[in-house]
Amino acid sequence: MSLSHLYRDGEGRIDDDDDERENFEITDWDLQNEFNPNRQRHWQTKEEATYGVWAERDSDDERPSFGGKRARDYSAPVNFISAGLKKGAAEEAELEDSDDEERPVKQDDFPKDFGPRKLKTGGNFKPSQKGFAGGTKSFMDFGSWERHTKGIGQKLLQKMGYVPGRGLGKNAQGIINPIEAKQRKGKGAVGAYGSERTTQSMQDFPVVDSEEEAEEEFQKGLSQWRKDPSGSKKKPKYSYKTVEELKAKGRISKKLTAPQKELSQVKVIDMTGREQKVYYSYSQISHKHNVPDDGLPLQSQQLPQSGKEAKAPGFALPELEHNLQLLIDLTEQEIIQNDRQLQYERDMVVNLFHELEKMTEVLDHEERVISNLSKVLEMVEECERRMQPDCSNPLTLDECARIFETLQDKYYEEYRMSDRVDLAVAIVYPLMKEYFKEWDPLKDCTYGTEIISKWKSLLENDQLLSHGGQDLSADAFHRLIWEVWMPFVRNIVTQWQPRNCDPMVDFLDSWVHIIPVWILDNILDQLIFPKLQKEVENWNPLTDTVPIHSWIHPWLPLMQARLEPLYSPIRSKLSSALQKWHPSDSSAKLILQPWKDVFTPGSWEAFMVKNIVPKLGMCLGELVINPHQQHMDAFYWVIDWEGMISVSSLVGLLEKHFFPKWLQVLCSWLSNSPNYEEITKWYLGWKSMFSDQVLAHPSVKDKFNEALDIMNRAVSSNVGAYMQPGARENIAYLTHTERRKDFQYEATRERREAENMAQRGIGVAASSVPMNFKDLIETKAEEHNIVFMPVIGKRHEGKQLYTFGRIVIYIDRGVVFVQGEKTWVPTSLQSLIDMAK
């Protein structure tokens, strides 16, 4: 029996020194490494099979290589091993699988070169000194000298704010416990004995390194291709992806999607690799790196290994892995696309459901429209049948209105969209003409207003009304009024007399809110105004007994500015009639007074100045002033025109024709030893003849003040003063009283004007509007650049004194008093401004 199989290596080969032969028996190793491209090619020699571990090795074996064997250390003691049977392939595979798992590695597994060599005399030699692998002393007594010092370091740290038990740093972010060291079990390199992390490191940094995780996953995946060495059937761990996870991811790979049509037939030459490759679409380029290149050298796929003898890595099937991964990706993309298609179909169902509802609503609406149109057509045909002459039950206007009301209320949409013009022309117009056949508008102006108002709401086009149009072809009501109602009005206007205006005015007032605006304008412009213009041309103010305003003014609310062309001939005729007029004739005032508010202010003032004021001046010039026997008729004739002529024109007449004679008579009277009481009464009597508006005029005020000055000078002179005791005081009191009244009136008027300006928002801003007379004076001073300020420490009768420019004044109950030569004199605000300038 051959014992060669006892010395056969794991590869099933027996090597000799000169010749080598290979046993052709199939072993487990052959089956396992059948597809392994990285299996070892070394054959066992005959010497190795004979002498076993005592076989001499060639120098080639001792050179550095990527293998897991190491050179023997002959300085180490001799360790005898039993000459047992060589392990079979299955047992060796079990050992290799067990090596893949993490296990504590013994120190003997590594070369002795990692630690310092020690002299050993035998297998049982024991060193006399125990220590750590590096030959260093124990760290147990490190820093023991600190126990014999005074702890200056601790004290310095405490002075700098260190709190025992807390970390260093401003925010105590330093570590509290010192870094914990872990003693390595043997003399191997770092990582040879597994993880060297301490308990403190696991607590402070619980996160596992990503490289360690990747290595663990790789080892687990690699071990799935090998048989479990323990013989137990361990279930492999699989990573599953649920459909929900794929839906959440929801991304479709661009590599797996169908290429675009325009890029699917493009020829591409790839020269980036070792050899030229031709692709027939861009989509193929995206897949070129998924399949590994064939023929890669074995050395490029092997990683250098050091340490113990490396075992053969598990063989890889990249094509199989690629195909499996491609199937997985295609399945995932199919799931995602199916989910999207399902969602699309669901949305389409919802959309179609809504469209079905809309179409159902449209269908119902169309059915209702068809039904309504059928009913409307029946009603129209009924009206047409009853409009026939031989019908026993003819249609009346009220019944027709009710039919149209039914159409408008129940079938509004169809009625609004229908051609109401043609329908009204065919049905309503004949009935309306029959209704107004015997109508006289001037006798019964309200006839038909109710029925026309009803038809207005039925026939008028709201859209046309909002645009203000007058298209007869688009609005049935406008056409009805123009073709049916308007002919009756034309016939009446041709027979109407303009002087009898009331019936026509009442008629148009009754219909103004019913008929369209453009029809009313046509009536006024084309029918009424020509009749009035012709009648004005025939009017004679001297012979006609009926005043012209009695038949012109009633048209003002309706025609307004349309009557402007009539005013010029009316003024011309009135001016001709006033050429021989005398102010004693009051009829002229009665004729002209109604026109004052009709004519414009400019034209009215020009008419008065041209025709009335000269006549009044002549009358006032004929007035004789006699204190003993006064005739006031001429004065009354002139004053009676106040309000008709302007105040300025009236004051001009008084200044020219009245006050010179009046002052002359006063001077003559004072020079003849008069009775001052009679003069006072005469003065007050003439002053009472004028209105407050005339007295407030500065010219009239100056004339009366001049009369007071004449009276004061007369009583102040020695001549005749002794003849009447108390006359001087009476005249002075009269002067003071009159001037005070004038100034109070002036102040009140100015204050009222200031308040009106404030209310209208005209002038100064609201914040600067004067609230009292002092503020008004201050505002006027600012406007005229005049200094207005109080005099410090100066008062008169308890009133504060002020400087207004160069003048000293004080204010008492809304009246300004100016300091004169001997006394304080009241004055107006305008006079104060003039004196200050």
Curated annotation (Swiss-Prot):
SMART domains linked: G_patch (SM00443)
Region (Required for nuclear speckle localization): 710-734
Bias (Acidic residues) ranges: 91-102
One GO cellular component term: spliceosomal complex
Ranges annotated as biased composition (Basic and acidic residues): 1-13, 53-64, 103-116
Stretch list, region Disordered: 1-21, 53-72, 85-133, 179-236
Modification sites for Phosphoserine: S2, S59, S98, S144, S210
Compartment(s) where it occurs, according to its Swiss-Prot or TrEMBL record: Cytoplasm; Nucleus
GO annotation terms (biological process): biomineral tissue development; spliceosomal complex disassembly
One Gene Ontology MF term: nucleic acid binding
Domain (G-patch) ranges: 149-195
UniProt keyword terms in alphabetical order: Biomineralization, Cytoplasm, mRNA processing, mRNA splicing, Nucleus, Phosphoprotein, Spliceosome
Signal peptide (residue range): none
Motif (Nuclear localization signal): 700-705
A Pfam family annotated for this UniProt entry: G-patch
Assembly mode: Identified in the spliceosome C complex. Found in the Intron Large (IL) complex, a post-mRNA release spliceosomal complex containing the excised intron, U2, U5 and U6 snRNPs, and splicing factors. Interacts with TUFT1. Interacts with DHX15; indicative for a recruitment of DHX15 to the IL complex. Interacts with GCFC2.
Function according to Swiss-Prot or TrEMBL: Involved in pre-mRNA splicing, specifically in spliceosome disassembly during late-stage splicing events. Intron turnover seems to proceed through reactions in two lariat-intron associated complexes termed Intron Large (IL) and Intron Small (IS). In cooperation with DHX15 seems to mediate the transition of the U2, U5 and U6 snRNP-containing IL complex to the snRNP-free IS complex leading to efficient debranching and turnover of excised introns. May play a role in the differentiation of ameloblasts and odontoblasts or in the forming of the enamel extracellular matrix.
Family: Belongs to the TFP11/STIP family.
Name listed for the protein in its UniProt record: Tuftelin-interacting protein 11
Protein's organism: Macaca fascicularis (Crab-eating macaque)
Source lineage: Eukaryota, Metazoa, Chordata, Craniata, Vertebrata
